[in-house]
């Protein structure tokens, strides 16, 4: 009898036959595990609870994902990639706008991507608290990828070379770090897009304040980080 891809025998112990789950089903289980870890953290989440929520045996869970630590690491990596994919979609949906309005939309999108259902950053927050070295590496990679997305959008949408270079050098590195950190904080406080919208809009206003200052200030007379900190104090 021909078995389906998700029903292929994997291993046998006693009377139990392990069956290899399809890639789609494995991704569904990782999403379920993500919700469990996001609610309780790594230490307080048991593999029994994850298996029960997923509707599979604990043995099958371990057979596919290994130890709880390995599963948590996969969840954190997947969460970061989901957030980046969601951010790309958000950027793609931004209409043609003047540079400063585009920056405002990008800042809001970066913040709100952290509190959306897809890619919610709560599990990343737990990772940074409970598995710092691993999660920090994933987070740094996400920062770099997000900076690249910002620079690509600015390069595509801003025809003026002066505007592009000023923003890429003096705004993007600081704005991305700040927006992602703020989004992470909102996710930790259990905000959803509806409740985070006003906070994101206000914070994006600070980023626009900085961008305007950068574009209007003579070369060599400002520092992006100090300018952003000053703007944050003024809108607080």
Regions found by a protein language model. Give the residues of each.
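Short, basic, alpha-helical segments at the C-terminal edge of helix-turn-helix-like DNA-binding modules
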Residues: 47, 77-83
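Amphipathic alpha-helical interaction segments
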Residues: 28, 105, 123-126, 166-174, ...
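Short alpha-helix boundary/capping elements
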Residues: 69, 80, 115-118, 132-133, ...
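Hydrophobic alpha-helical connector segments
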Residues: 74, 88-116, 158, 165-169
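Helix-turn-helix
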Residues: 28, 32, 36-70, 74
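C-terminal peripheral helix-coil segments that are non-catalytic and often amphipathic
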Residues: 1-12, 112, 147-160, 171-236
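Amphipathic alpha-helical packing segments from all-alpha helical-bundle domains
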Residues: 84-85, 101, 132-159, 166-167, ...
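Amphipathic alpha-helical segments used for helix-helix packing
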Residues: 115-137, 182-189
